[in-house]
């Protein structure tokens, strides 16, 4: 039995009146498979699914809000390193596209990296760092931003002197990174 299934079973063993599932990562998504369909449930995050009640983050608005300040700083465009898109249009990548469109900027192709694959994000940073026209990057989450910064530094680009990079989620470890 895998650990997610075991943890769900343990939680259900106390006979809860309902469950709250945080659908932000693979474990949260996998947990949905093991929860009985008749169990009252609230799903937080993720995308629109079958749950009776859901709390959906303003992912698209967030992507726009992260991109606009970079454009306000005078960057001609903002490149994006993101995750695979969900089944709805409520994505950070679409918010990034919205911001660029609002300013009349043609969106460059985003670099999509697999979830939780930091090495691919480092490679994306190297790839973007080798381009002379990259001055701003919106990373889809903080982990991706840190990995992109590493890739940029590996090819001699300075952050923020040469390239502005923003992440998303405001994870507490972000303050530990320089």
What are these regions (language model features)?
Residues 1, 5-13, 17-18, 29-178:
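Bacterial carbohydrate/catabolite-sensing allosteric modules
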Residues 24-27:
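Beta-alpha junction/loop-to-helix N-cap segments that form part of ligand/metal-binding clefts
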């Amino acid at each position: 039995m895998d650990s997610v299934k075991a943890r769900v079973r343990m939680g259900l063993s106390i006979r809860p009146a309902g469950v709250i599932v945080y659908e932000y990562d693979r474990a949260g998504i996998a947990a949905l498979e093991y929860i009985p369909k008749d169990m009252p449930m609230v799903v937080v995050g993720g995308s629109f699914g079958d749950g009776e009640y859901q709390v959906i983050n303003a992912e698209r608005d967030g992507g726009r809000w992260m991109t606009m300040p970079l454009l306000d700083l005078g960057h001609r465009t903002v490149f994006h390193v993101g995750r695979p898109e969900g089944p709805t249009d409520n994505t950070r990548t679409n918010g990034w596209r919205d911001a660029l469109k609002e300013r009349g900027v043609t969106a460059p192709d985003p670099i999509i990296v697999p979830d939780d694959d930091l090495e691919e994000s480092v490679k994306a940073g190297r790839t973007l760092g080798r381009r002379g026209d990259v001055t701003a990057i919106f990373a889809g989450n903080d982990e991706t931003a840190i990995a992109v910064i590493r890739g940029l530094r590996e090819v001699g680009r300075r952050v923020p002197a040469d390239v502005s990079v923003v992440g998303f989620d405001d994870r507490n470890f972000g303050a530990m990174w320089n």
